[in-house]
Amino acid sequence: MKKILFFALALVASVLAFTSCEKNEPELKGTVYHYRGISWADFEYEHDVYIALEDNHKMTMKWVGVKTSEDAEPVNLYLYDGIWEGNATEGYHIHCDALPQLPDGKPFDKWESFDIDGWCDATSCSFDYHINGSTMGIFDGEIVND
């Protein structure tokens, strides 16, 4: 009986140890956009707002502001005629000088957008973007604070 009890306790301890070693990565939600071979995404992570910009298969992520209201709509920042626009005017404080410049200096005037799901830790993020349940691609990169 003692052997069975010892075995059961060892099994429970090993299961608990295994589950406690799993990476605890907060999920994030946002939107990814595509235009002329350049992709970018906006997302929130622990009340901070980031933009991830991908050009030529290289990605940088940059902090651009903070969420100031729990009732705010999900962040949505996009470029139109070279100007950042979106619904992040209420419930967010976006630092305009922190918004990235376009790699080629051309304005985005048309885009495709997809919802994203993923995770972040203190230095990097990884998320996939999808439409109608089909994964369209993956962003994965370091957070760069300029």
Ranges and model annotations:
Residues 3-5, 10, 14-37, 133-146:
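Bacterial Sec-dependent N-terminal signal peptides
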Residues 74-93, 122-146:
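Edge beta-strand at a domain terminus
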Residues 26-58, 104-109:
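Short, solvent-exposed loop/hinge segments that bridge or flank secondary-structure elements
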Residues 25-36, 56-61, 89-97, 123-126:
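Short, hydrophobic/aromatic-rich segments at coil-to-beta transitions
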Residues 44-85:
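N-terminal glycine/threonine-rich, aromatic-flanked beta-hairpin/loop signature
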Residues 91-117:
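An anionic, turn-rich surface loop/hairpin at beta-sheet edges
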Residues 40-43, 66-76, 101-108, 134:
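Short, cysteine-centered beta-strand-loop-beta hairpins and adjacent loop/turn segments enriched
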